[in-house]
Amino acid sequence: MAAKIIDGKTIAQQVKDEVAARVTQRLAAGKRAPGLAVVLVGENPASQIYVSSKRKVCEEVGFISRSYDLPATTTESELLTLIDQLNADQAIDGILVQLPLPEGIDNTKVIERIAPSKDVDGFHPYNVGRLCQRAPLLRACTPRGIVTLLERYNIDTFGLNAVVVGASNIVGRPMSLELLLAGCTTTVTHRFTKNLRHHIENADLLVVAVGKPGFIPGEWIKPGAIVLDVGINRLESGKVVGDVEFETAQERASYISPVPGGVGPMTVATLIQNTLQACEEYHDHAE
């Protein structure tokens, strides 16, 4: 029996429509539109694509979008000064600094300089700590987007054995905290994990984020499992595939997210959700 496809494109559009409707209500009530500042340092082609999609969605939902395209020669102190200015700017609710940053700029220092109430990527240690303490404020976009997918498909996560493959700060680690919060018994696997297959064969819910095409063979998937594939890998042929071998996995899983069109669209939709949340929960009352 083929798995049900988790259609991230459709759910992401629903989320964007909900945010756009809320922006319209705000403007009708005499309030300002939420504002997002997107900072890009250097000319990494992949980063440029991500940034342009984020800016486009901002315009779609009626946000104020500000772009800061800085040369690769920008110093760390120049970038930190810009962040200080944006932290103080009352028209800006969210600050997004596109990673990776050029050599010589400390990612951690930059992330920690963003005011936690404007950290719409959800990477600041304060926001990660709040999630860890079961009192989340702004949450990392991809994990929160995955939780939204599970909720919209009415998938009951309580009591499931969840396995997260990949332990990055951006996806794997916050994802494990989100799944704990969602009532799962959660295992995080990484490059030092022994017998990865054993963990995956026992996973009721599997989230894979390693950035290696077809890294998880489809026959490892437990029958009836829910599979969320975060990987976006472009093959030499130009085809885009995930980290899970889709064709075989689809025959075994009960739900599976495709690549493209699964988790990917949810990341940007969640960024927009986070920016609206930052505006309404943290900044409206300060004005």
UniProtKB/Swiss-Prot annotation:
Cellular component, GO annotation: cytosol
Catalytic activity: (6R)-5,10-methylene-5,6,7,8-tetrahydrofolate + NADP(+) = (6R)-5,10-methenyltetrahydrofolate + NADPH; (6R)-5,10-methenyltetrahydrofolate + H2O = (6R)-10-formyltetrahydrofolate + H(+)
UniProt entry keywords in alphabetical sequence: Amino-acid biosynthesis, Histidine biosynthesis, Hydrolase, Methionine biosynthesis, Multifunctional enzyme, NADP, One-carbon metabolism, Oxidoreductase, Purine biosynthesis
Keyword field contains Oxidoreductase: yes
Enzyme Commission code(s) on record: 1.5.1.5, 3.5.4.9
GO BP terms in the entry: L-histidine biosynthetic process; methionine biosynthetic process; purine nucleotide biosynthetic process; tetrahydrofolate interconversion
Record InterPro entries: Aminoacid_DH-like_N_sf, NAD(P)-bd_dom_sf, THF_DH/CycHdrlase, THF_DH/CycHdrlase_cat_dom, THF_DH/CycHdrlase_CS, THF_DH/CycHdrlase_NAD-bd_dom
Pathway connected to this protein: One-carbon metabolism; tetrahydrofolate interconversion
Pfam families documented for this protein: THF_DHG_CYH (PF00763), THF_DHG_CYH_C (PF02882)
Annotated NADP(+) binding sites: 166-168, 232
Gene Ontology molecular function terms on file: methenyltetrahydrofolate cyclohydrolase activity; methylenetetrahydrofolate dehydrogenase (NADP+) activity
Subunit structure: Homodimer.
Function (record text): Catalyzes the oxidation of 5,10-methylenetetrahydrofolate to 5,10-methenyltetrahydrofolate and then the hydrolysis of 5,10-methenyltetrahydrofolate to 10-formyltetrahydrofolate.
Family: Belongs to the tetrahydrofolate dehydrogenase/cyclohydrolase family.
Annotated protein name in UniProt: Bifunctional protein FolD
Upper classification of the organism: Bacteria, Pseudomonadati, Pseudomonadota, Gammaproteobacteria, Enterobacterales
Gene assigned in the entry: folD
